Amino acid sequence: VEIRGTGGFLGTYGIMTLDKGRLTVDKVATDSDLKNFPAPVVDLGPDYRQLYGNSPALWVNMNMSPNFPYAGQQWAKAWELQTGQRLDGVLGLNVTALQYLSEATGPVTGAKGQTIPADQLVDYLTNGIYADFPELSGPVNDARKEFQAQIGTDLLKRAINFRGSAASLLPELQKSVTGGHLLLWSAAPDVQRVLTETALAGATSTSPRPYLQLVLNNGAGNKMDYYLTRKLTYTGGACKGQWRDSTVDVVLTNTIPAEGE
């Protein structure tokens, strides 16, 4: 719900095991279990420090950069420091990826017993669920986090144990990858080099050519991102020798209603 460079902040995490081609979900929990640090756990260089300062010392801020390999490195190291367990990789998926899994495997049940079809799941998880759990602290907030984790767990297990036609699941997974909603970082350098050549890596461009990316981070913790719309327009100017003047217009609009929910 709160924007970070790679999508949203880490609110739910899980541990999975891949053994002889079989993937199992060992544990899913909320960020309440995760212990923050006094300083960032990985030194990603002076440019990174200048941009983000000490904020990535918190688990929920380790993906402020849009470069997912940075997030993967930090989350893996933070998990090792907290638990002593070394991870082989980090898989990131957001609520849109969950929607695509629901498209293939069926609707989910909301907190009040209501049926949530796939095309309403993102809206429910980013907005509607707060009407079902109308407090942002205390036991009600904890219950909301647990319920969100339950939805994610259910959809992951459905996908892992999917017995339907691959023709219905694979296109949804492909949409997740090409849209940047399903990302993977590997702790094995050789594997990561291969991943970096694909959309699955979520890596920012290292090309020496001009490159521009709009990146937003919510530092207020207010869950209001649902009401933010973004529009970016790029206008390329005529080439003048080795140079060209271009214009980028960014419009951020607050659509919060004047009253009501």
Predicted regions and their residues:
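Non-catalytic, solvent-exposed segments at the cell envelope interface
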Residues: 1-261
